[in-house]
Amino acid sequence: MKTMNPYIRHLILLICCLGGMLAQPLSAAPQDPVEADRIVAVVGSDVITYFELRTRLTAALKQLQKQGTPLPPQDVLERQMLERLIMERAQLQYGRETGMKIDDTQLDLAIGRIAAGNKMTVPQFRAALEKDGVQYAQFREEIRNEMVTVRLREREVDSKLVISEGEIDNYLANQTATGSEEEYQLAHILLRAPESATPEQLQKLRQRGEQALKRARAGENFAQLTAAFSDAPDALQGGDLGWRPLARLPALYAEAGSRLQSGEVSDLLRSSAGFHIVKLVSKRGGSAPASVQQTHARHILIRSSEVLSEAEATRKLEAVRERIANGVDFAEQARLYSQDGSAAKGGELGWLNPGDTVPEFERAMDALKINEVSQVVQSPFGMHLIQVLERRERDVSAERQRAVARQALRERKLDEAYQDWLRQLRDRTYVENRLDEQ
């Protein structure tokens, strides 16, 4: 049997929150059935049990051990993990209330893509999961939940971001003035503040932030501090933001990061989301891109409606994809079935630049090889089949520079907007924390 790629295994352990017993003085779940069923939080109409919390915490500790991160105190991690579970439940509940659904057909497609990305069939992938101790039924539900939260972010945050022409002008002027685009690797800690926080709450949060900052500047492991203090989704990954030019970082982080030397930690920063600490891990030079990669693609679009559900549209496109795989011409199928204006041209979209299409479409297109046909892809416009015909590098014209700038600014704003949305959602969700109750 094929073995699972370690990185995929790591992600699955993180997503599913499953895992074996640890060498820590911590059991994967309490032995006492009464303790296991104890409710540690009420989130709207849902509850979180102690068993769920300990199962998730076991996986988190296993992840931190693999990374070689020194472990924070157990009670600190327990509280941090419960807050993450509360945020997940709040999002899932909001998704249900607003009609966000992932049907089995869409779920099967997603799992098929995960398996294919790991060079396995779905049965092979399922066997590999079960060999690692991951129950397939639970894995499916966790993936379904992940898909709901991603769709929520796209609907509630991504689609509402607005980039003005003035912002683009300022971005391009700054790029011209600097002549280069250095990249920064930042790590961060976020202490999220309630939307209507009282002065007492803010003072308590500030003191907590100052405590974390003092320990960071004393040389304590930043990843450990992130796991112990941060409310950000990437807390268990050390708060690592990866390599980004300043233009693609939240403005607050870009300003702070530009003043730091490698290894230095910022002051305690304040934003509408709460308090932040930023560490510059490293910095490297670069130059502003003189060209972009263009993609020549075509697609077939079927829109869902009151008379055609998303599942039915998906099945219809799957049948089209199978015919194409058996030798039927893509352009012919586009003319017959596509509901896009490009149907008459066989689905031709011409040469596309970064930012020309919606993010869901672009991500799927960028992952394809030449002549490869995608699985069914969902975007705000409907369901798509995408085929990449060619790729090329082209000089960035003034128009294209603006498109690239728009995308960079969008990425910069997205993190801030998402954190604001999460904070607002948390504040309007009824939450009762019972962790300390015996």
From Swiss-Prot:
InterPro entries found in the cross-reference section: OMP_Chaperone_SurA, PPIase_dom_sf, PPIase_PpiC, PPIase_PpiC_CS, PPIase_SurA, SurA_N, Trigger_fact/SurA_dom_sf
Biological process, per Gene Ontology: Gram-negative-bacterium-type cell outer membrane assembly; protein folding; protein stabilization
Main location: periplasm
Reactions mediated catalytically: [protein]-peptidylproline (omega=180) = [protein]-peptidylproline (omega=0)
Subcellular location: Periplasm
PROSITE patterns named in the record: PPIC_PPIASE_1, PPIC_PPIASE_2
Lineage top rank: taxon: Bacteria
Cleavable signal peptide: 1-28
Pfam family, one: Rotamase
GO CC, alphabetical: outer membrane-bounded periplasmic space
Keywords attached to this entry: Chaperone, Isomerase, Periplasm, Repeat, Rotamase, Signal
UniProt key word Chaperone: yes
UniProt function note: Chaperone involved in the correct folding and assembly of outer membrane proteins. Recognizes specific patterns of aromatic residues and the orientation of their side chains, which are found more frequently in integral outer membrane proteins. May act in both early periplasmic and late outer membrane-associated steps of protein maturation.
Domain notes: The PPIase activity resides only in the second parvulin domain. The N-terminal region and the C-terminal tail are necessary and sufficient for the chaperone activity of SurA. The PPIase activity is dispensable for SurA to function as a chaperone. The N-terminal region and the C-terminal tail are also required for porin recognition.
HAMAP family: Chaperone_SurA (MF_01183)
Name of the protein in question: Chaperone SurA
Native organism: Dechloromonas aromatica (strain RCB)
Phylogenetic placement of the source organism: Bacteria, Pseudomonadati, Pseudomonadota, Betaproteobacteria, Rhodocyclales
